[in-house]
Amino acid sequence: MLLIPAIDLKEGRCVRLRQGLMEEATVFSDSPAETALHWFKQGARRLHLVDLNGAFAGVPQNLPAIKDILAAVAKDIPVQLGGGIRDLKTIGQYLDLGLNDVIIGTAAVKNPDFVREACKAFPGRIIVGLDAKDGMAAIDGWATVTGHHVIDLAKRFEDDGVNSIIYTDIGRDGMMSGVNIDATVKLAQAVRIPVIASGGLTGLDDIRALCAAEKHGVAGAITGRAIYEGSIDFAQAQQLADSLD
């Protein structure tokens, strides 16, 4: 079970949002590169970046911070990024910078053909991020809940060639209320590619529950607020996950 620290970027700083609201941002660091190095030293084997401004603007907005992070850690561990990725040119630019994978979110739901095109152009490098409320996909920074069921979308994107799915239960993210294990397992059982859980991780009990779900295809978990506020010690949590594998 891979635990992946999240670094959410807003105006060049490392923040966490509550329920996806930009006005509900808590600043944790003015130096995202130092934050990335910290998690690497704590034993992180992959990092998850989100360009929050980019997600709302539809184009990259935090390139200096992203470049600094990649300069600090990309030679040692893979880094993935989402937020504002709407075209193939942006994907190519990001991969050229040294990102290992890019995550397509809102654009995947609005324009599923874009995912197929991206997988053809950059095979093995595309992840789709699906955010859901009560099983239905949400888009535009969670502002809109669609009529598309996440399982139907995940199956389509699997056929298109994405390497994994990141699943966020938007009722849980940033609320420290526990991971929605049942919904995550249900999605993982519906596809053959790995599913990464995101949203709501609170403590070691969540780690144990996720490890128990690994046999169903839940390959990892992205953690944010819990490791920044200290309810989870990242190094301890990754050691626990490794011991349960």
UniProtKB/Swiss-Prot annotation:
Highest taxon above the source species: Bacteria
Protein location: Cytoplasm
Reactions this protein catalyses: 1-(5-phospho-beta-D-ribosyl)-5-[(5-phospho-beta-D-ribosylamino)methylideneamino]imidazole-4-carboxamide = 5-[(5-phospho-1-deoxy-D-ribulos-1-ylimino)methylamino]-1-(5-phospho-beta-D-ribosyl)imidazole-4-carboxamide
Keyword Ubl conjugation: no
Residues at the catalytic site: 8, 131
Enzymatic class: isomerase
HAMAP family named among the record's database cross-references: HisA (MF_01014)
Name the record gives this protein: 1-(5-phosphoribosyl)-5-[(5-phosphoribosylamino)methylideneamino] imidazole-4-carboxamide isomerase
Origin species: Neisseria meningitidis serogroup C (strain 053442)
